[in-house]
Amino acid sequence: MLLSVALILLCGMGMSWICKKLKLPGLLGMLLTGIVLGPYVLNLLDENLLNISSELRKMALIIILMRAGLGLDISGLKKIGCPAVMMCFVPATFELLGMLVLAPRLLGLSVLEAAILGSVLAAVSPAVVVPRMVRLMEEGYGTEKGIPQLILAGASVDDVYVIVLFTTFSGIMQGKSVSVMSFLNIPISIILGMIIGLLAGWLLARYFEKVHIRDTVKILILLSISFLLVVAEDHMTTAITFSALIAVMFLGVGLQKYREVAAKRIAVKCGKMWVAAEVFLFVLVGATVNIGYLSHVGLKAVVLICGALIFRMAGVFVCLLGTDMNGKEKLFTMMAYTPKATVQAAIGGIPLALGFACGDVVLTVAVLAIVLTAPLGAFAIDSSYKKFLTKTK
């Protein structure tokens, strides 16, 4: 396993550096590293490491969401108002509707199969979007109008909404009954996640105020509590649950609100941890990609993904109607909401594992969506934000 860790870090960082020199997103190099080192090409990664790949990816996601929370300006979101709430579910709903319209015609899927495919693809990738929005906030681009805060918060909640839809549609395919409670649980889990996160942040702020410990110990405490929140959500069997990832982000928000000095120092350490976490995250996402499936994908699947993204961008545009954003800022927000990676890698293979007839198609299109949209979306954000957004002086 030590050899695998060394290969992931050295090759991942090396390929990232090469891609950046070529003016391409570094994550493209990391994804390619994972694909080449993974079980479907050279098979150089230890099987035991791949068995815990999903846990390692979740740990990396927790680190960047915590970092996002520590720097998220809630007052900026309040100023935006209703569009901030709409961004959490309207773009994903539009993309799902696009799949329902296009997938039966292009791939011959039933409406329910198209809904399952749409719910797999409709989530934006926080692993791609969140670190870039954090960088924009640090550099001051678009912050006056709350643009990076809007995208960051929406991308985090969007995943919760889509995963609940995927679970519901998969249940219908298996013949299970669907209750109204499963849909009511979407807003409830988000709100509960916010409350639990803020409460935990407040408690930690009080603790750090009374007990003086090193910042390194503080971040270890934050990470441990974040892991416990995720485990608690995974083991909940009640009808009402909470979103652990939202709780993790709002843990950072709460600490920033009640103990800002400590939050700023911890945010710096989170940023340093993300250097290694990002490499593991995208290399391991790449390792899940079976390029053999791509040989079965025709032009129709590419057209389907592009068509669904047009629906998604239309959904973002609808959310932004009535805001004070200009055309360039709206276009940037629409582009920033397109990358796919983490959710698709996590749930893309589930329909096949459950024996659904559409399983092969869903996994193939999910793989293609990662390969196409993660690097292209990252490139669109990286190359346009200085041109499209205003820097706060």
Question: Which functions belong to the PLM regions below?
Answer:
Residues 1-393:
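Transmembrane helical cores of multi-pass secondary ion antiporters/exchangers
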